């Protein structure tokens, strides 16, 4: 570490989540393909919960929605903040892909993707409120498809399962 620091590196960022799990995780390109397939194939709204901090994943979801003529509604403060930061820094270029919940009311369900927080079952996150029926702007529809685009952080399985059970 001292050698790297002496070479001018000022910050090392690392993620050790699931580092004790054996084997390999899927490549991000495999995940990207699966997300694109879902967005393309589903005839209803697609609700994707993912980590707001994963800008690369957000960017791919946005590109898949553009390719498949879907507009995006974002829910969750951290998601909205991450999108705004990415737009302001040129990481995401097309602001017109984003709409609000009122604009979506007049659209075909196949033309809408909802990007939200709540992959870990956090009780106040957007997905939990959607699942509980307490979200002020959106309710689940029979043809909605909910995608958890994340892995469970150890210790969160029970909270995640509670949200999944409420989605049924």
For the regions a protein language model found, what residue spans apply to each?
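Conserved acidic residues
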Residues: 10, 112, 144
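Aromatic- and Gly/Pro-rich donor/ligand-binding loops
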Residues: 118-119, 150-154
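His/Asp/Glu-rich metal-coordinating catalytic cores
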Residues: 1-107, 122-139, 155-162
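Extracellular/luminal Protease-associated
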Residues: 146-148
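Short helix-loop-beta junction
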Residues: 165-168
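Conserved two-lobed SF2 helicase motor
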Residues: 111-120
């Amino acid at each position: 570490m001292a050698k790297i620091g002496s070479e001018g590196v000022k910050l090392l960022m690392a993620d050790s989540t699931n580092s004790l799990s054996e084997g390999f995780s899927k490549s991000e390109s495999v995940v990207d393909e699966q997300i694109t397939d879902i967005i393309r194939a589903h005839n209803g709204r697609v609700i994707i919960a993912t980590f707001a901090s994963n800008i690369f994943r957000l960017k791919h979801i946005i590109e898949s929605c553009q390719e498949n003529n879907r507009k995006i509604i974002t829910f969750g403060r951290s998601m909205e903040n991450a999108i705004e930061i990415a737009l302001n820094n040129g990481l995401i270029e097309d602001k017109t892909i984003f709409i609000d919940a009122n604009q979506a009311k007049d659209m075909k369900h196949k033309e809408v993707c909802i990007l939200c927080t709540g992959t870990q079952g956090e009780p106040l996150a957007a997905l939990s409120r959607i699942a509980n029926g307490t979200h002020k702007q959106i309710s689940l529809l029979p043809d909605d498809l909910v995608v958890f685009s994340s892995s469970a952080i150890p210790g969160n399985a029970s909270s995640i399962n509670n949200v999944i059970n409420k989605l049924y």
